[in-house]
Amino acid sequence: MAESGGSSGSSQSPERPSSLADRNGALKCTFSAAGHSTGLLQGLAALRAQGQLLDVVLTVNSEAFHAHKVVLAACSDYFRAMFTGGMREANQAVIQLQGVSARGLRHIIDFAYSAEVTLDLDCVQDVLGAAVFLQMLPVVELCEDFLKAAMSVETCLHIGQMATTFSLTSLRESVDAFTFRHFLQIAAEEDFLRLPLERLVFFLQSNRLQSCAEIDLFRAAVRWLQHDPARRARASLVLRHVRFPLMQPAELVDSVQTLDVMLDDALCRQYLLEAFSYHVLPCRQHDMQSPRTAVRSDVASLVAFGGTPYTDSDRAVSSKVFQLPEPGARHFRELTEMELGCSHAGVAVLDNFVYVAGGQHLQHRSGEGAVDACYRYDPQRNRWLRLRALRESRVQFQLTALGGLLYATGGRNRAGSLASVERYCPRRDSWDFACPLKRRTWGHAGAAAAGRLYISGGYGVSAEDKKALQCYDPAADRWEPRAPMREPRVLHAMLGAAGRIYALGGRMDHVDRCFDVLAVEYYVPDADQWTSVTPMRAGQSEAGCCLLERKIYIVGGYNWRLNNVTGIVQVYNTETDEWERDLHFPESFAGIACAAVLLPRSGHGR
């Protein structure tokens, strides 16, 4: 009973311990063997070397290559399509290949089993041709890398032919860049004489040629033409891309007009006549603009003219001209000098000629030092040409290019502030008066946009004039008011960029003190509306200003917080609305005049 009673009570079987998998079901790791890929390749290479499991023979010109289909298909899109795409070769043990060389195929198969390829200038064309044909992109890229590293004056044009043959864009661009840098050296090579016409024209017409005087380019082109008598008929097609007007007159007389190739071709004679006319009539050079008169440069430089240190002990102003070679540069260097020192002049650019007018040749705090001089700077020849003087002396005025003419607006001189506007015609080398401003104005800023001339701020007759915006219509010869700026400012900067007109910096007066204006705003002519953007970090009035690749550079000027001239160069990105890292001008000057100019990349004539 006791036993039966005991057996009828509840009993529990021993608890089964949970498995390791149950307790750690969430634990999962993936491991990789670092040397597996290398070992796999080595194993496949060993099978090939020992003749094991080989299932295909590729033949080229009676030379046979044994391989594994799976290896070829894994490496090459061409073989993958052949062996898996239902082609008849998929079931063939021996396949004859067309379109590749035996040497090229050998390198390709060796690469498939080793991931390595040995290249030299003798075999690379065969290897590259095979890699392109068999669609083995890694080998194509290795060949491109090798050819870029092997590029030299001697090999450049041959590599360029390969780039063209196999449609390798990146390699072609590298060849072009190298050729532009070393064109004259390459032109002395024998390969240059075999250059196709279209490639020669491509280089001669480009602005990217560096360190090349036009007379040397002409000699290279003539050498190419004289290599084959049949090319003489194409002389004008080639020489039309030589910029004869940029040569020195003596070069035209002594080295160009004496050659039969120039005298026998009617168009070549026209090119020569064009060049002589360009030199004889400098004031009409604007009417003769063509691709042959353009400076060989594809990047504009910031060029800064003159300025004053505002020292009490010395009234001298600077005659130095500095350049910032390109937008990415960090340092200015001296470019040339003006005939006389000048500050607070007007500067404008027409057809890449820089006009510098008015200003002062001695430091004055008022308009007493205003001058009427006007000069034109030719960056190609690094020469100054004195032009007809302004009708009125002007300082702290605006000089603006619009419609092929120059407009000098307002300013001041010994007699006081001015409302007059002068218009300069380069062809006639003369100034005449246009419609005057509504009121006397100096210390204003100006810019051209959409066929109109705009001036803003400055000292007028009332406090409101410091915010005023006036618009000049050259067709109607009339000034009209537009929406005023949000901030009053004088001695500020103004320029057009991407359909907007920016007003930057300057100062404002309060009782007997002056304050920096840090606010920046832009005007949209179609909307007649101003919009504020990120302010400047430091004050700059009486500063130079120009636009390079959508960035505004404000150069030097006067800082009223420091009560001194400054050498800072602030850079504003119009696309991102951000101020970038500051630059530093070589001098601390106010009254600098700035312009964006294409400077020749060669030292010829400089």
Curated annotation (Swiss-Prot):
Task: Give all Phosphoserine modified positions.
Answer: 430
What are the residue boundaries of the BTB domain, all occurrences included? 54-121
Q: Which residues form the BACK domain?
A: 156-257
In the UniProt record, the signal sequence range is none
Q: Which top-level group of life is the source organism from?
A: Eukaryota
The UniProt annotation puts the region (Disordered) at: 1-20
Q: Where is the composition biased (Low complexity)?
A: 1-19
Which InterPro entries does the protein's record reference?
A: BACK, BTB-kelch_protein, BTB/POZ_dom, BTB_POZ_KLHL26, Kelch-typ_b-propeller, Kelch_1, SKP1/BTB/POZ_sf
Asked if Acetylation is a keyword of the record, the answer is yes
> What keywords are annotated for this sequence in UniProt?
Acetylation, Kelch repeat, Phosphoprotein, Repeat
Kelch repeat extents: 301-352, 353-404, 406-451, 452-499, 501-550, 552-599
Protein role? May play a role in endo(sarco)plasmic reticulum (ER/SR) mitochondrial signaling. May be part of the ubiquitin-proteasome system (UPS) and affect ubiquitination and degradation of target substrates in cardiomyocytes.
Q: What is this protein called?
A: Kelch-like protein 26
Recorded source organism is Mus musculus (Mouse)
